[in-house]
Amino acid sequence: MFPALETHLKQTIPDPYEDFMYRHLQYYGYFKAQRGSLPNSATHQHVRKNNPQYLLHGSLGGKDDLIPDTLQKEKLLWPTSLSSAVHRQIEAINRDSHMLSLPHLRSRQLLYDELDEVNPRLREPQELFSILSTKRPLLAPRWPIECEVIKESIHHIEWAPPQPEYFYQPKGNEKVPEIVGEKKGTVVYQLDSVPTEGSYFTSSRVGGKQGIIKELAVTLQGPEDNTLLFESRFECGNLQKAVRVDTYEYELTLRTDLYTNRHTQWFYFRVQNTRKDATYRFTIVNLLKPKSLYTVGMKPLLYSQMDANTRNIGWRREGNEIKYCKNNMDDGQQPFYCLTWTIQFPYDQDTCFFAHFYPYTYTDLQCYLLSVANNPIQSQFCKLQTLCRSLAGNTVYLLTITNPSQTPQEAAAKKAVVLSARVHPGESNGSWVMKGFLDFILSNSPDAQLLRDIFVFKVLPMLNPDGVIVGNYRCSLAGRDLNRHYKTILKESFPCIWYTRNMIKRLLEEREVLLYCDFHGHSRKNNTFLYGCNNNNRKYWLHERVFPLMLSKNAPDRFSFHSCNFKVQKCKEGTGRVVMWRMGILNSYTMESTFGGSTLGSKRDTHFTIEDLKSLGYHVCDTLLDFCDPDQTKFTQCLAELKELLRQEIHKKFHELGQDVDLEESWSDISLSDIESSTSGSDSSLSDGLPVHLANIADELTQKKMFKKKKKKSLQTRKQRNEQYQKKNLMWKLKLTEDTSEFASTLQKHPAFFKNSESSSFLPMRNENPRLNETNLNRRDKDTSLDPSMTTLILPKNKGRMQTNLNRRDKDTSLDPSMTTLILPKNKGRMQVLHLIYCI
């Protein structure tokens, strides 16, 4: 009568709808159950309600993932959080993961509070677009199938150093390392299979490469063995090889961006089995940039697990004898540069990490967004959606932040602000600035509430999750720099960029976009600054510089207005900043935050900390309020200051050129691009163009075309044919005998040898008329004579056609069947000439 209430009723015939939804959701990674079984949706919702923060660990998207595997089980994993205690729970759950095995219910609409009690209620409707909520699980990161990934959970605490971390001051006696490599050293760590140039991304899965994870580090021979144990097969990790060249000295090789042979800048790896009293030297041997902030005092980052556990100390700047220079390696293609430093570890048998900058992983982002989605207050004005899926199938998140409007007219009047980060995966600076912005805009601060009242914020916190996960520095899994492809039409190859541009295009149709800003990191300049676009409209002249100037006043010890640049270069046409500007967003910027630190004010010669970067996110919000203040006093003052700064810059430029000019009348008509220098160029132009899989096909087609061109003879012009004919004619004359008069008399003495000689004429021999009707020599040879020692031989008709190829000019001609005349030498010496005459 009431089958839905029979909790232990076995379902022998699968429900078609349930079966369809199971297969559909399994494709997106929500279920990994045993073959032939169906998920208990009521049970899943019960678990999610009581334990909202869990990860569904499994693989999806690959061919093998579409078919349920009897050996695969559904694992419930707690996500990374800010508490180290929670992370210890993660590892325990990983070890003792279990599978939901409860009887399936017929009804899909009734739920139960307890498994043993009958208290049915209707299921709540699921949200269509929200991904992270108490009702939906997080998806684990997906890796290319070539990448091995360790199962350990890596987590770091946030920490602000109590004292400023000053730049390293070079002493001038820093050691220049001599790279010896594997010949004189011992390889102690090396990745087996690294996708490089020539290969391309094909598929992905959770956990990366299938099979048993190999132990790449060396095996210690005993407790006295002091060899360091290296590891980098985790999120954002990057280290390809480590070579031990001395007891405490190691040469390190970074992995290039996947499917490329370039972009070695970001590093992040783990070392174990440390010794406290020893001085270690590390040398990265394959860096590609000739300039670096390491030359002006930047230090690497060190993280000690023992310090984090016992003293609550996180990442800190460490290192001595730091030197960045060109190394002695030469592969014949491009020069390499090396970074070397020495360090003393704080503990014996410690687990430590080195990094180029403060890491911020895809899992860190997901945990932050999960906390927002589960916050009952923040979730009211922050809606989380999926913009798209990356090439590997990872979610690209889109946040819409605004307070609910009272009327439709009020909602339509709101202007929009678009912010994005991590299009370059190795620039984790952008994620920390973005986190500072989100912390403030989602807070209950009166300024934050006001901003939510007047703006609609569209936030893309991580545009390139694939690159972040695998530890790339600049490229996506397409092997290309996404910040050069904002004009792309290749949606399948660059989905993150294509959908971002499309979203902004639709947004512009709905409302005005006041500001677009993409958060980046810079490896060759200190401080923070903006790149913008000069406005050619005289009505809004210099308006694009007001926001950067205001930001420099709000953060005077971190932001440098004089480092800003507004020149639009041709090589930057594909960047987000320029494309959005051409789409109509006047205030379109790229914010560059240094990997180093500040040279300004109270923070002069100190490294940026995580808190410094997060404060920049707050200052973006503060500057937005100043920029949009109905009282235009600040705006007007900044505009006047900009005009004065520009006047001084123009005077300086003309003074450098040795010219004097009166700028009282027409100085505002001078093009701003003419007085601005170009931005310090990046090496992204090398990663522009087609995605690598299409580039490989294009290269193959080009090679085939070139081969065909070489094989096929090109047609000659008339002029070339005439020149070739004259040259051959001259060579022919030189081979003939010198006595032309005797040849003429020979022809007169033997007229019978030539049939119809009276009516014969000398016709030129052409390819289109190989059969000649004349008995005389070809017109090309009419001025030549045969040697008198020659004799003529008339061959009878029944001998058949004579096939000869002695004369290449006549190789395509056929002999007349009636008569063939050969002129042969009398003596047995070398033949001087052999000529065929065809008769009618």
UniProtKB/Swiss-Prot annotation:
It holds the Pfam family Pepdidase_M14_N. Binds 1 zinc ion per subunit. Transmembrane segments: none annotated. GO terms for biological process: protein side chain deglutamylation; proteolysis. Signal peptide: none annotated. It is found in: Cytoplasm, Cytosol; Cytoplasm, Cytoskeleton, Microtubule organizing center, Centrosome, Centriole; Cytoplasm, Cytoskeleton, Cilium basal body. Keywords: Carboxypeptidase, Cell projection, Cytoplasm, Cytoskeleton, Hydrolase, Metal-binding, Metalloprotease, Protease, Zinc. It is an enzyme of class 3 (hydrolase). The keyword Metal-binding applies. One of its GO terms (molecular function) is metallocarboxypeptidase activity. Inhibited by RARRES1. The active site is at residue 592. Its cofactor is Zn(2+). Its EC number is 3.4.17.-. Residues 706-726, 758-789 are annotated as: Disordered. Residues 358-628 form the Peptidase M14 domain. Metallocarboxypeptidase that mediates deglutamylation of tubulin and non-tubulin target proteins. Catalyzes the removal of polyglutamate side chains present on the gamma-carboxyl group of glutamate residues within the C-terminal tail of tubulin protein. Specifically cleaves tubulin long-side-chains, while it is not able to remove the branching point glutamate. Also catalyzes the removal of polyglutamate residues from the carboxy-terminus of non-tubulin proteins such as MYLK. Interacts with RARRES1, KIF11 and MAPRE1. This is Cytosolic carboxypeptidase 2. It comes from Macaca fascicularis (Crab-eating macaque). The lineage of its organism: Eukaryota, Metazoa, Chordata, Craniata, Vertebrata.
